[in-house]
Regions:
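Active-site hotspot residues in diverse enzymes, especially metal/ion-binding acidic/histidine motifs
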Residues: 1-324
Length: 324
């Protein structure tokens, strides 16, 4: 088997360039990406000599997809197959899974002969497998949601679940995948929180919000995951499954170290199918601790100055000279 020479992002960018050129000449919808067509044409396009077959089957709900070599044990005779779970109801998840397996084919097929991908398996992957799975996800996200195009879809300063949902529809992916991609490039301080039964399962932050997500992902001293605050809108309005535009909440409800008076915007969608709640938090620009201290000092100075003026006026009114 010929070893690929580039990583997940360069491979995705190469395919993106080819797709842009194809649609510029032949027209048709650029998005969502027809991943099945791309998979079938990739071996010929890049002359790998290792064809890929695709087959969907109804399988266990936890299984998502797999890539394996039908000629295992025969070097340089790769004949690959991708199997995906046809029982998954979300076409966006299926599209992402297929792109993920294509990423394994392009980036990792020289490293091993089979890739079995399911969320449950993550608990048992070693560091090498985790790295490869992360790279396959990265490839899929760049292929399906090119950042330069994504930026053009999010031009308003106000971002909500309607805006991001429109991007999910454009790219034919799940809302979760669309939000995670947005977090990669947004300058906003934002965190996506996935919870189940009021307990944080995981959190992912933007570049400026990564420390906030780290705080939510950190387990308690007893080893348990953190509960959502009882004062969060997600808990207070648990009966309402959707809040696409957001409710203003004191930032300290979620992040106690944030300054007093700061409010964040909390949006959420409850998925009955997956028995979990997705909450998106968007915060104002960070106020550094030393900036808070300076602000407090300025407030104190203002108070002292005003107090001094009041005392001086009082003395004058009382016929006394002001203190100099």
């Amino acid at each position: 088997m010929t070893a690929p020479t580039t990583g997940p992002v360069p491979w995705a960018n190469r395919l993106t360039k080819l797709l842009n050129q194809f649609h510029a000449v032949h027209g048709g919808d650029r998005f969502p990406v027809d991943v099945e067509m791309l998979i079938r044409q990739t071996p010929e396009q890049f002359q790998t000599g290792e064809p890929i077959a695709i087959q969907g089957q109804a399988m266990d709900p936890e299984f998502e997809g797999a890539l394996f070599n039908l000629n295992a044990g025969q070097p340089d005779k790769g004949n690959w197959a991708i199997i995906y779970n046809q029982a998954i109801s979300s076409l966006g998840r299926i599209r992402f899974t297929l792109a993920h397996e294509l990423g394994h084919y392009l980036v990792h097929r020289h490293l091993q002969e089979s890739f079995n991908c399911s969320e449950a398996d993550m608990l048992h992957w070693d560091s090498t497998e985790r790295k490869m799975e992360g790279e396959a996800d990265l490839f899929a996200s760049y292929l399906l949601m090119p950042i330069d195009d994504y930026r053009k879809q999010v031009t308003s300063n106000t971002v909500d679940l309607d805006v991001l949902g429109g991007c999910a529809d454009r790219y034919g992916v799940s809302l979760t995948a669309a939000i995670l991609k947005w977090l990669e490039f947004t300058p906003k301080r934002a965190v996506l929180v996935m919870s189940r039964n009021g307990v944080v399962q995981w959190a992912c932050g933007s570049e400026s919000g990564k420390w906030l997500s780290i705080a939510l992902n950190k387990k308690l001293p007893n080893g348990q995951r953190r509960n959502l605050s009882e004062q969060s809108a997600t808990v207070l309005h648990a009966g309402a499954n959707v809040d696409r535009y957001g409710t203003e909440v004191d930032a300290r409800v979620w992040f106690p170290s944030e300054p007093a008076g700061m409010a964040l915007r909390e949006m959420r969608i409850v998925s009955d199918q997956y028995r979990q709640t997705m909450t998106l938090l968007i915060l104002p620009q960070e106020i550094k601790p030393w900036e808070r201290d300076q602000s407090d000092e300025d407030d104190a100075d203002d108070t002292d100055d005003n107090g001094g003026l009041e005392n001086a006026f009082d003395r004058i009114l009382n016929g006394q000279p002001p203190v100099r």
